[in-house]
C-alpha cells in the first residue's frame, strides 16, 4: 500500500500525541470533539487517522476535496486542501447529533439523523438547514439511509417503513408514499429499514430487520433466512465473536428473534437482520447480516459466506464497491475485499486500522479509502 499519515485532532487547539507504530495501534478514549483543532503530520507512518473521540462513525461521504464524516456527535466536514474542519451538530441546525447517513441528494448535502429526521444543507456558507420530519411525510424521525434513484424518486429508510418521494418532490406532501409491513401485506418484511440500493434495472432493494425486499414494477418481493438468506446457526455458532445482541437490549429486537425461533440462541445471531447492502458492478446483490455472515443473490438464489470461507467476521456492518469492481467488506473483525470470486487479505488494527469494527467507508477519486469505525476514520491507499 502507498500511504501517508495525517492526524486531525478535534481537541480544541492542541495537536494529538505522536502516532504509534503500525504494529502498536491502541487508541485510548479521546475527549469530546470540539469546533477547533490543529494538524500534526508524520510522513513515515502508514495510515492517516482522524480521531473523533468517543463516537461511532456511521457514514463517510467524499465530496470533491472535502470529506464529510457522520458520527454520533454530529457531522464533521474536513477539507483535504488546507486541513480545515467544521462540526455541524444540534448547536448549528441539526435536530439530532446522531448521524446515520451523509450524502448529496438533488445536489445538496443531506443528513439522515437518529431521531431528528432528514436535514438538507440549503446554504453551506451560512450553515442553514431545512429539515424534513414526520409532518412533511417521513415515516419516522430515525433515518438510516437515503437513495436518489435514476428515475428521480427519493427513497428514505426509516425505522417505521420506507418512504418513496415520487419524482423527488420533497416539498409536495402528496408525492410522499410510505411502505410498511401492513400496507404492503408483508411485501416489506419488517418496518425497520437499514439500507437501500438500486439494481441495474432500476429495481430498489431494501435491507430490513426481517430480511431483504425488492421493489420492481410496483410490487414487493422478499427473502428471509427460510428462503436462503444468511448462514445457518450451525455454520457460525463456533465463531460468534461479536457480543452485542440487540435482543437483550430491546423488546422489539427480542420479538424479532422469537419470531424466527431463535429465542433460545443466547448469542448475537439473527440472519434476517440485514445491516448492510450493496449491488456490485455485475448486478449481484450483497447483504451483510447480524451474525449470519455475508449473502450474495445471483438472481435466483442466495449464497452465504462465513468465517470458514475467509470472511473476517460473521457480523457484516459495511459493504462498498470501488471503481475497480472490488467489493469492500467491513465486519466486526476487520476489513477485506471480494474480487475474482474470493476474499482478499484481512486488514485489522494490527495493520493500522483505527478499530476492527468497520461501520462505514467511502472511496476517493484516486481509489483511496476513508474507513469509519468507533473513535475515528482511517485513510489509506490500497495496493494497485
Language-model region placement:
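Bacterial N-terminal signal peptides
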Residues: 4-14
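Carboxylate-rich, polar loop motifs that coordinate divalent cations or form catalytic acidic clusters
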Residues: 17-384
Amino acid at each position: 500500500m502507498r500511504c501517508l499519515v495525517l492526524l486531525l485532532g478535534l481537541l480544541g487547539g492542541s495537536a494529538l500525541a505522536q502516532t504509534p507504530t503500525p504494529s502498536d495501534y491502541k487508541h485510548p478514549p479521546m475527549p469530546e470533539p470540539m469546533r477547533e483543532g490543529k494538524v500534526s503530520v508524520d510522513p513515515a507512518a502508514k495510515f492517516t487517522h482522524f480521531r473523533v473521540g468517543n463516537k461511532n462513525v456511521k457514514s463517510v461521504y467524499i465530496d470533491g476535496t472535502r470529506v464529510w464524516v457522520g458520527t454520533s456527535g454530529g457531522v464533521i466536514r474536513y477539507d483535504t486542501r488546507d486541513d480545515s474542519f467544521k462540526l455541524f451538530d444540534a448547536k448549528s441546525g441539526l435536530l439530532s447529533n446522531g448521524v446515520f447517513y451523509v450524502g448529496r441528494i438533488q445536489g445538496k448535502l443531506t443528513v439522515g439523523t437518529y431521531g431528528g429526521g432528514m436535514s438538507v444543507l440549503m446554504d453551506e456558507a451560512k450553515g442553514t438547514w431545512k429539515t424534513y420530519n414526520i409532518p412533511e411525510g417521513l415515516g419516522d424521525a430515525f433515518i438510516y439511509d437515503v437513495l436518489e434513484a435514476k428515475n428521480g424518486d427519493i427513497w428514505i429508510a426509516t425505522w417505521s417503513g420506507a418512504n418513496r418521494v415520487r419524482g423527488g418532490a420533497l416539498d409536495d406532501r402528496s408525492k410522499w408514499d410510505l411502505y410498511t409491513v401492513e400496507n404492503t401485506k408483508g411485501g416489506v418484511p419488517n418496518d425497520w429499514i437499514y439500507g437501500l440500493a438500486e439494481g441495474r434495472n432500476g429495481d430498489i432493494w431494501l435491507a430490513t430487520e426481517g430480511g431483504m425486499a425488492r421493489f420492481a414494477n410496483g410490487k414487493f418481493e422478499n427473502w428471509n433466512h427460510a428462503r436462503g438468506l444468511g448462514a445457518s446457526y450451525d455454520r457460525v455458532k463456533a465463531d460468534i465473536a461479536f457480543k452485542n445482541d440487540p435482543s437483550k437490549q430491546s423488546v422489539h429486537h427480542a420479538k424479532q428473534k422469537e419470531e424466527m425461533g431463535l429465542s433460545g440462541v443466547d448469542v448475537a445471531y439473527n440472519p434476517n437482520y440485514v445491516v448492510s447492502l450493496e449491488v456490485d458492478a455485475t448486478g449481484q446483490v450483497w447483504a451483510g447480516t447480524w451474525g449470519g455472515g455475508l449473502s450474495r443473490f445471483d438472481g435466483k438464489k442466495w449464497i452465504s459466506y462465513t468465517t470458514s470461507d475467509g470472511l473476517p467476521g460473521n457480523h457484516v456492518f459495511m459493504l462498498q464497491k470501488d471503481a475497480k469492481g472490488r467489493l469492500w467488506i467491513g465486519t466486526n473483525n476487520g476489513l477485506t475485499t471480494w474480487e475474482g470470486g474470493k476474499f482478499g487479505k484481512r486488514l485489522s488494527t494490527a495493520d493500522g486500522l483505527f478499530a476492527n469494527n468497520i461501520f462505514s467507508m467511502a472511496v476517493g477519486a484516486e481509489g483511496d479509502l476513508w474507513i469509519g469505525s468507533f473513535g475515528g476514520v482511517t485513510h489509506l491507499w490500497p495496493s494497485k
